[in-house]
Amino acid sequence: MATKPDDAQLSATAEELEMTKKQDEEHVAFEQISPEEERALVRKLDRVLMPLMAFVYFFQYLDKQSINYASVFGLRKDLRLTGQDFSWVISLFYFGQLCSEYPAAYLMSRLPITLFVGVTIIIWGGVEMTLGATRDFHTLAAARFFLGFAEGAVSPAFIIITSNWYRRREHPIRVATWVSMSGVSQILGALMMYGIGGAKEMVIEKWRAMFLLSGGLTAACGVVFCVMMPRDTTMAWFLNERERKVATLRLAVDRGTRDRAEFNSKQMTEALKQPMVWMYFMMALCITLTTPILKFSSLVVNGFGYSPFQTMLVGLPGGAISFVTIWVAALVPRFFPGTRVYTSMGLCLVPLLGSTMLLALPAKGYEWGIVASTWLAACCSSLLSSSAAMMASNVKGNTKKSVAWTESDAPRYTKGCILSIASWVALIVTYAVYGFAIKKENAKRDRLAGEGRYEYMVGGHDGGEQAVQMGVAVDSDLTDVQDKAFRYNL
């Protein structure tokens, strides 16, 4: 005996029919857009969005590196840092960043993300300037903690912003554009410190001037970001009405969503249960565990007999190598689709080699080999770029401690090198498991689509040669788990 459907079932069916109708309408509208029109739109997006994001990331990395430069220009002596003090100063930045992640994730889903990010940029610029006013370990440690807290939201927010404006195939190049500023910042930041270090008759210590200058520039960049960065495709001041519509439809057809100022607790629960989310966590953890070399590289080089000025100059090639590897991570998958995971595994070998060289090379007679090892060991930004692109493309929906690097181990920092080597090996394993998991999930969804279990194609809904991939309404806020027509990018 057939049971009568209840109100909830009828409501769900009506919502499904309405969603299908909206998807079909959006696809018909999008098919009327020529490739030339879409390319012109993307160029327009790039001209406005990429410079804003690139400048912010440049200053974020400069602010992170400033402690590295200051360490060889008298900071440790002036503030009377001893023992593990400097290691704790480095660590507290990451403690602050860790403490900020959950409140930042909540606020990003409740507030307009671009305004939220702009305000945090201004705040962290102000905190960076306070580093120039520190008088001892305690004030420096507190400032570093709050600097990490203020900066914690930027990289996750930039991943979301990228996915809110660009189609999945466009993510690697755009992520590489702003992440590659880390290499540029490494070069220009060292030259800036070299110039400040050579200045005569300064009324304050030179390392204090570095913090004041970089912090002031960061705060100014935050003001520009607040004013110039639009919230989403529907509010882009630099696009006309037609272009805003096309920009929104692109996301719908590509199974994306735009910024929604609301927190979805169900998506949070889903994320905590999804194995791939924990793989992203492992990627971030492994990369983060290796980043102290970025803060200690100047001390490593300086500890092997180089002057502060020589230390700034011999570190420049490290920025260039970082820049090149970031673009390798972006361009190889572009020309050879489906190779992003394998490219990332290969790029892990660069810092793995550097960490191994730093650990194993003799101290005498191999000075340049040790310098080169710091260049290679610090090339973690390419893995950050690649992992960030994976998250931007494959996650839908809206919603440490460094005591291994201790003074007693200087200048080689043996425990830190061993930790880095272990982290890179763990990251390679994580990438391999992740690649296997998404290939398996895609194959499962293809099989279910072939059986008619999930609708995957439209265009008469008959799956013929003229059928095209169905889009999802841009306001649907379906996650990658809920949207069974979604396919993960390998």
Q: Where on the chain are the PLM-derived regions?
A:
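Structural signature of the two symmetry-related core transmembrane helices
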Residues: L115-M129, Y342-M357
